Amino acid sequence: MFDAKAFLADVPHLPGVYRMYDAKNTIIYVGKAKDLKKRLSSYFRSQLASKKTEALVANIHHIETTITHSETEALLLEHNYIKENQPKYNVLLRDDKSYPYILLTKHQHPRITSFRGSKKVAGEYFGPYPNAGAVRETLNLLQKLFPIRQCEDSYYKNRSRPCLQYQIGRCLAPCVEGYYSQAEYDNQVNLVRLFLQGKDGQVVEHLVQKMENAAQELDFEAAARFRDQIQSVRAVQEKQFVSNERLDDLDIISIAYQHGIACVHILFVRHGKVLGNRSYFPKVPNNTDLTELADTFVGQFYLQMNQHRTIPNQIIIDQPLSEATALANVLSEQAGHKVSIADKNIRGDKSRYLALAKTNAEAALTLQLKQDTHIRQRYDSLKALLNLAEIKRMECFDISHTMGNQTVASCVVFDENGPLKSDYRRFNIEGITGGDDYAAMEQALLKRYGRHLEEEKIPDIIFIDGGKGQLNRALETFASLNVSWDKRKPLLIGVAKGVERKAGLETLLISKWDKEIHLPPDSPALHLIQHIRDESHNHAITGHRKKRQKAFTESGLESIAGVGAKRRQALLKYLGGMQGVKSATLEEIQSVPGISKQLAEVIFDTLQHS
């Protein structure tokens, strides 16, 4: 029993962070406070604020505190602890992806392209965009409006005549001299810059001036080109919501919460334009109040989830934040510019955007609730079928190869909410007879389970995509494991496809019963098994294809003396892949940077006689 009175006697009235541990020495909650003594004392009153707090306090074994210089420092430390430990009773945002940007490169003839990751490439970055699809859509639009290049620098350097993009009017062909001047290209680059900054009006004004100048000089062909550009830009403007207010960089957040599931929807506005939107479904402990959810989400989203995320000038949210001022100060320091947080009195076009975010949040939550209902029905059906009290984690294995070559095994994981893609794994299978699926499965299982596993990582069910032979090999492999965790816990099930290999005709081979089960095609349990089996199959095939493609592109070059990884990469890049290398002339191979005349002859002769 935790002695709260003795513990609180030594806690100071200072700002800091506290970490609550259970009997297994696992951190179950992380919090911060302006006054540690006051905050921690509130957990041990006779009447607690919520059932969530009651459950938390009942599991406390001991508490550790860290004193900080300020509330701001405590806020940062709190989110670092949450990210590192993923405590059970904290709201957890499960999203660690970098966000894509549009990059205008620093070059004599800049290119526009998508970019993801640390901003190490020289140039101007616009974004972030919520997903790769939004970037592709914008790049396609830019290519139609402004004819500047999107090709790789290696492709650009090796052109001797304009490519198809020039012929269809989507590039000025700066790679070849004599088609357009540097000034004309720079002008189009500047228009792209203005457009991405949301200054559409300036783009139109500039093009109108250019059109009028061309007409006065009787260059009617150029005037017609500018006229077409003006019409295209105006057509884009008409499709967009045009605000009378000055809307710079905003993130607009709305939270919908129902039946223990939360949806946080964000509209990303940059330079007055909505770049896109995204819905998040954080893991929320039961009976969490909305203020805590809003506080934790905003803190995690901007402070801990991704170092490349751009922090906007203003964050608008439809739920009150208890720590808005402290959070705004921290974000301002992180961003290098003033960041404000508004959670009330939102008016004008910002109010309209917030209403749009709310509509999207509610719609996404409704859809998620329906999906969760289907998932629960399927899990309940499978639990009843197998006579299991609970199913918290399932894993499924599949093997993929082409005639025994480039064999890959996949392992996919489902938890109570469906696919847990962050835990998916692939295994390269080596040292076996080609086409021996039993040996491949054994190797995959040994790689996956022949090591220490935390209790929560031990699956309740392991599905093996295959018949009785595969299942028996899997059982033998498990029997041979020498591990500290309970290897008897997982129930192994073989999923045989049947003679016609059609969905709905699967046979289940249940290891603990040593019998076969045929489920009706409309069985929710069967649908869940088909889902995890298909996920595993697709994951294996994707991995196998990547491995096969890599072997194909590298074959023929690895064996040549003097051709290492860098030269091999240069040959493939400059000559357009392995097919381009094989069909290249001696002179073309010699023109690749880093390839001498002597080495080019060796490469050419080797490929011609291979």
Curated annotation (Swiss-Prot):
SUPFAM superfamilies: C-terminal UvrC-binding domain of UvrB, GIY-YIG endonuclease, RuvA domain 2-like. Residues 13-91 form the GIY-YIG domain. GO terms for molecular function: DNA binding; excinuclease ABC activity. Its main location: cytoplasm. It comes from the Bacteria. Residues 201-236 form the UVR domain. GO terms for cellular component: cytoplasm; excinuclease repair complex. PROSITE patterns: GIY_YIG (PS50164), UVR (PS50151), UVRC (PS50165). It is found in: Cytoplasm. Interacts with UvrB in an incision complex. The UvrABC repair system catalyzes the recognition and processing of DNA lesions. UvrC both incises the 5' and 3' sides of the lesion. The N-terminal half is responsible for the 3' incision and the C-terminal half is responsible for the 5' incision. HAMAP family: UvrC. Belongs to the UvrC family. NCBIfam families: PRK00558.1-5, uvrC. PANTHER family: UVRABC SYSTEM PROTEIN C (PTHR30562:SF1), UVRC/OXIDOREDUCTASE (PTHR30562). This is UvrABC system protein C. The lineage of its organism: Bacteria, Pseudomonadati, Pseudomonadota, Gammaproteobacteria, Pasteurellales. The gene is uvrC.
